[in-house]
């Protein structure tokens, strides 16, 4: 529990004791402690007096006064309590207690802000899962950035997280990929009798694969059609996945598992899943197809599992896959999906309910669209290729750090305009530059301090820190752990980028108002230790969203 959370908890406990002493209520409602928007209203505030009005049957200001009269403030660093407006209780703290965060941050280093105890909860987080049929585009990039950041944050908050990529290597799109490669393969051998599929893949990469295979594997031309299709399917997927993994790795996005859809067919998981659902009485035959009674579990209609032609729908392997996830001992499943998958939420949740699995254990977060903007206009196509802009091109254009940060700093359920020009600016208007510059500026000051013989020390006299801007900065540092917890709980990495901006702003304000290296040696030592705590916090926060913290810029 962070220092700030400890203070809040102490205030809640003391208010509860005061309410009982004043005989205001036996069953006490939830007591909330908030940070006022206006610092003039204190460091913390509670509206409990208004909440108790109906229970105590008294004027809220009278209730507030009764609470204050019985309040023991000695344990919570309170120096003043006021009653404001209709009955708000405002607490003004002796903020010297905040300096305890400095040695804590310095001592914990790279682990500062992280939970010290495991939540003993296993989460399987699936993200990206793009079809291995071409390059990753800007939508995949947002999914990757948010997914990887969320995984980092959940781990920091004490969850056990498995990062998984589901390889869609068994559907019709892979057959089309194989037939496209086949046409380019024979074309490279001078045989143009093999036509591209109507919905085939016409990218330059497919032409290159065909040429490469024609040189390295001329024997494939003599295979039977079935053998050739199987070979091109596997080689095509392998080629695309190798390229995709390289792009994701360079984007600082990582996975623990690469789960193949084909494996669900090969190990009998799909057949076993269908048998289980039939055994439980949730399947039925109608119109020549096999259906699942998903409407029994809040889906708007039942869903087809096996079509009239005997082939599975896309829903069938997806159902088997999610049942497999549960059977691997995961407590919570989180899927990050594109906006076009919104209709999948209820049917997937319903499919788990058929197995007696609480559908609340499956969380599906829909990622909204990203528009790339340049000079106020949307950029839809690459000038180089004429195709959709790829993740690789985004990384090359603005850099990995800027791409990661920009794609994470908005709520994933909101549409986002990615300003390519802003992402490249070296100014305080650019959020990532502003944050990284704060870190680099601190490193520069620490270097100067060291040259003057002043080292970072946890034994400095922190009573020297009494400047308002310094206290505001320490408050932000003290909020780091609770921000991680909040971002994890709400599956919201953008809460952390918002925090990073606030922390950087607090540092820049302090820097502009106060000199760190002064003639007062003791004060300088205290400030040097303080900005090292800020540096550690910035470094750790940026790392959680996959961004570097440069020492110079």
UniProtKB/Swiss-Prot annotation:
GO CC entries: cytoplasm
Reactions performed catalytically: tRNA(Arg) + L-arginine + ATP = L-arginyl-tRNA(Arg) + AMP + diphosphate
Molecular-function GO term, any one: ATP binding
Enzyme Commission number(s): 6.1.1.19
PROSITE patterns reported for this sequence: AA_TRNA_LIGASE_I
InterPro entries according to UniProt: aa-tRNA-synth_I_CS, Arg-tRNA-ligase, Arg-tRNA-synth_N, Arg-tRNA-synth_N_sf, ArgRS_core, DALR_anticod-bd, Rossmann-like_a/b/a_fold, tRNAsynth_Ia_anticodon-bd
Gene Ontology terms describing biological process: arginyl-tRNA aminoacylation
Chief site of localization: cytoplasm
Domain of life: Bacteria
Pfam families the UniProt entry points to: Arg_tRNA_synt_N, DALR_1, tRNA-synt_1d
Keywords, sorted A to Z: Aminoacyl-tRNA synthetase, ATP-binding, Cytoplasm, Ligase, Nucleotide-binding, Protein biosynthesis
NCBIfam families from the UniProt entry: argS
Name under which the protein is recorded: Arginine--tRNA ligase
Origin species: Staphylococcus epidermidis (strain ATCC 35984 / DSM 28319 / BCRC 17069 / CCUG 31568 / BM 3577 / RP62A)
Source taxonomy: Bacteria, Bacillati, Bacillota, Bacilli, Bacillales
